[in-house]
């Protein structure tokens, strides 16, 4: 196993670590859980609320494009920016910054549909967040301390990539860290990814934050180049619509002052300084997509 699972073994030994991890494998069935109970809950839901039929945003593609002209299978670029959030929201609590770290994000919001989501993790434990985003399942219902990719995604299961493959999509994942970390190399195929591009496959990328991370972390800008490169490769090799999932690393914990030069720091923490490049990288991904003849969802 890779990731934080090795910490238990390192501190307490192989046997204790192994036995501890065994307790995370079994998911207990909730009391009174049955297909009949689920059907009964659905019967209490208004029929109009079961399936959304109206656009969520008045300016969205589905709202402004006639239904008979809409592309049914858009390109989907699913980007998870490590630990990214709008820190400018802290200003309502009296916290100020030396620079506008959310300027690019706010510019993106002017031309995009957007909303809010709550993450099950912060600064790390990325496989928990990925698992929720790709499957719709909550890690809250897994045994405490378990990591889904290592202990529960051990065979093909319902997930967005598998579902989209049934709809004719080609699928790929891009992550700028080692393939075996969190057992992504084993979990991704079970989720439905045809290809997985990891750090081992990336050459000539720019890295930062070498004070804490010995070999550094790939920048969001370089990661954007990798995403574009993979998109172009998929586009040229097949006529199938594209689903591309990508996970960045630049703003991963640990957040200490030695990770950033003086001109990139702000008053409160070094974490906000790492947030600045992320929206620009998103712009970079959207620029080539804007020339396509079909809509592109870059989340």
Where does each model-flagged region fall?
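Helix-hairpin-helix/helix-loop-helix acidic hairpins
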Residues: 11-71
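Solvent-exposed soluble domains appended to multi-pass membrane proteins
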Residues: 52-72, 78-299
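A feature for loop-to-transmembrane-helix boundaries and adjacent hydrophobic helices
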Residues: 2-3, 18, 211-213
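Transmembrane and membrane-interface helices of multi-pass
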Residues: 1-9
């Amino acid at each position: 196993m890779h990731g934080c699972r090795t910490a238990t073994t390192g501190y307490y030994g192989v046997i204790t670590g192994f036995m501890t991890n065994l307790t995370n494998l079994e998911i207990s069935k909730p009391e009174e859980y049955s297909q009949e109970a689920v059907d009964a809950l659905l019967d209490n839901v208004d029929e109009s609320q079961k399936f959304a039929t109206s656009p969520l945003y008045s300016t969205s593609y589905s709202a402004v494009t006639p239904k008979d002209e809409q592309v049914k299978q858009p390109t989907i670029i699913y980007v998870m920016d490590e630990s990214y959030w709008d820190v400018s929201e802290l200003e309502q609590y009296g916290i100020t910054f030396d620079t506008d770290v959310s300027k690019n994000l706010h510019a993106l919001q002017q031309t995009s549909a957007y909303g809010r989501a709550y993450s099950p993790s912060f600064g790390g434990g990325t496989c928990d967040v990925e698992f929720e985003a790709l499957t719709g399942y909550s890690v809250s219902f897994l045994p405490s301390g378990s990591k889904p990719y290592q202990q529960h995604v051990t065979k093909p299961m319902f997930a967005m990539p598998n579902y989209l493959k049934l709809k004719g999509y080609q699928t790929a994942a891009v992550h700028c860290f080692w393939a075996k970390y969190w057992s992504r190399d084993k979990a991704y195929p079970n989720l439905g990814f045809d290809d997985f591009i990891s750090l081992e496959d990336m050459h000539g990328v720019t890295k930062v934050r070498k004070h804490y991370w010995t070999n550094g972390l790939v920048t969001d800008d370089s990661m954007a180049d990798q995403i574009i490169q993979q998109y172009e490769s998929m586009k040229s090799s097949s006529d199938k619509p594209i689903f591309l999932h990508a996970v960045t690393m630049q703003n991963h914990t640990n957040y200490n002052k030695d990770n950033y030069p003086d001109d990139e720091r702000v008053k409160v923490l070094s974490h906000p300084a790492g947030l600045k490049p992320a929206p620009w990288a998103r712009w970079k991904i959207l620029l080539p997509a804007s020339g396509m003849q079909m809509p592109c969802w870059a989340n």
